[in-house]
Amino acid sequence: MAFDALFKPIEIGNLTIRNRVVSTAHAEVHATDGGMTTERYVKYYEEKAKGGCGLCICGGSSPVSIDSPQAWWSSVNISTDRIIPHFQNLADAVHKHGGKIMIQITHMGRRSRWDGFDWPTLLSPSGIREPVHRSTCKTIEEEEIWRVIDDFAQGARRVKEGGLDGIELSAVHQHLIDQFWSPRVNKREDQWGGSFENRMRFGLEVLKAVRAEVGDDFVVGLRICGDEFHPDGLTHDDMKRIAAYYDATGMVDFFGVVGSGCDTHNTLANVIPNMSYPPEPFLHLAAGVKDVVSVPVIHAQNIKDPNQASRILEGGYVDLVGMTRAHIADPHLIAKIQMDQTDRIRQCVGANYCIDRQYQGLDVLCIQNAATSREYLGLPHEIAPSDGPKRKVVVVGGGPGGMEAARVAAERGHEVTLFEAADQIGGQITLAAKAPQRDQIAGITRWYQLELARLKVDLRLGTRADEATIADLRPDIVVLATGGQPFLSQVPEWGYDEDRERSLVVSTWDILSGAVEPGKNVLIFDSICEFAGVSAADYLADKGATVEIVTDDIKPGAAVGGTTFPTYYRSLYEKEVIMTSDLALHRVYREGDALVAVLENEYTGAQEERVVDQVVVENGVRPDEALYYALKDQSRNKGQVDIEALYAIQPQPALATLDDDADAGFVLFRLGDCTAPRNTHAAIYDALRICKDF
């Protein structure tokens, strides 16, 4: 078959992995309780094993010591024997589906915060401040070094006693082990610093202690960085030397290799490459390490497509491929390949909604798959057909919520008609994909196009549904996903040009859609600070405009996630876009052929002016709810959603009334932005939890 390389089993130590695909270690925020794995945690990994993933490495940055705090992502706490029975439940859930599971263990040293959990004193080889967390730490003392080494050994013991298949020691992204490796962090002059051998000593002693505790048959891997990409950091040649050194000990069963350090905001963006990066941008680093070691090498960074993964393996670059975000988007991707259903794989688009939520201390969710990480609630990845009557379902609006509503209703076996006023489905995704760094987000729409065609949804494009259109179909259920429209009328002072009969300001939608030609000297005012404002700035600068983006927030793009805003800032700085904070757009007026934008400082009230030829405003959207109010009184439930049932992921009570009185009208629901403007995930989540019980 075309994917033979993916399905070839491999030995790691004494462990046989059924295929070459790995879900690598990452944080599973809010899936633990006091550091203990929960039902949510177990179900999340069980779904991946059920879907065919060969190896799951769970527990990104799981601490071995109480002075390596769990940080904001609530990682697994392996510093106590209380974790052992929790591991046993996790191991059983994965093993019964033929998968293998390991956990990443670490001491994060200085790369954490001191002001949470037990308020620890952070440790580092030389007490040098870590910039991203703004944490100043103490220089670790000899006695503490040996205590932490033993903590690693005891953590490994707990993993083994819990029935997991191995551990991955984290020596990447400036955790304590690689802090000792780094001359820019390790300034010691004792046996733990200075020479190469001395800087390697801490990691070596950790390996010795771990092996003494778990024996030679238990799998122990080492995750490393192939190049820190820092002026004073460890280079690729340095890392190959380090890998070869530890490989020669015979105590390492595999290496996980990724590119880039992450102790600055800029380098953090490299670690989990978003859609602006090319495929597998750091594969050459893993391949370089593979050349100097004798054990299997795993690489994971921007490997999202099975054809891409197969090509990497066939080329011999690495031995296993990490497809972590790909499994967040679709935990059944391996099973779909095996069933020759690759076109049904919900492919990751690199939006980084998952990881960016983690860095905000929120649970890890997928922008397009609302069932991921909610398996414990009963939200399904595969929609089962209804065992009730076949219904007529009308969906109005072909954005994210409407596409998901139509898909889920059709999977349930109902007759579904989807109306979309535009000539294509996609809604705001279509706009987002026009921005320079966002084109891959169109993959969400492409997947829905294939699914809706497979399910034979009656797709009526270029058709604006109204009361009569809907009445003609005599539906049982109507779902409104009509979205929203740019909200430009909030401030009348933004102005209206009587002579030209149009607003003095235009929206980011106008710019990205091409409805309005870009100006040459443009001011963008962004009060929302999500993707639209910085995307419009990037787009306009690409078109040759001189651009200033102004916000009344702390910075432009303030709500764009931690792995994503740096790529925008790189681009905007390179294109000489001016970024200004703390100014609100107070007034716009015309002066001859120019526009004058009056800006007001949020803190002092002082005003300043910009003279430009175009003012672009990003002020969010307002619900497009006219059709809802036109239909509300015709519906049997008056358009109301039972919020207790919604939040409990239970069927909507109104659905049970459909067989009571055939003349009582249809059941009406609205979801997504036409209820309250939010985001793509919210619209899809609304649709799944409402429509799964049709």
UniProtKB/Swiss-Prot annotation:
Q: What pH-related activity note exists for this entry?
A: Optimum pH is 7.0.
Q: Which domain of life is it from?
A: Bacteria
Under the cellular component aspect of Gene Ontology, which terms does the record hold? cytoplasm
Activity regulation description:
Ca(2+) increases the activity by 12%, while the other metal ions tested have no or slightly inhibitory effects. The chelating agent EDTA inhibits the activity by 33%.
Q: Is Cell inner membrane set as a keyword in this record?
A: no
Stretches assigned to coiled coil? none
What keywords are assigned to this protein?
Cytoplasm, FAD, Flavoprotein, NAD, NADP, Oxidoreductase
The UniProt record lists the EC number as 1.5.7.3
- What does the note under cofactor report? Can use both NAD(+) and NADP(+), with a preference for NAD(+).
What this chain does, per the entry, is described as: Involved in degradation of glycine betaine. Catalyzes the demethylation of both N,N-dimethylglycine (DMG) and sarcosine, releasing formaldehyde and forming glycine as the final product. Does not show activity toward trimethylamine (TMA), histamine, glycine betaine (GB) or choline. The C-N bond in DMG is probably oxidized by removal of a hydride equivalent to form a labile imine intermediate, which is then spontaneously hydrolyzed in the presence of water, producing sarcosine and formaldehyde.
The subunit structure is: Monomer. The purified enzyme exists in the form of a monomer, dimer or polymer under non-denaturing conditions, but only the monomeric protein exhibits enzyme activity.
Q: Which family does it belong to?
A: In the N-terminal section; belongs to the NADH:flavin oxidoreductase/NADH oxidase family.
Write down what this protein is called: N,N-dimethylglycine/sarcosine dehydrogenase
Species, as recorded: Chromohalobacter salexigens (strain ATCC BAA-138 / DSM 3043 / CIP 106854 / NCIMB 13768 / 1H11)
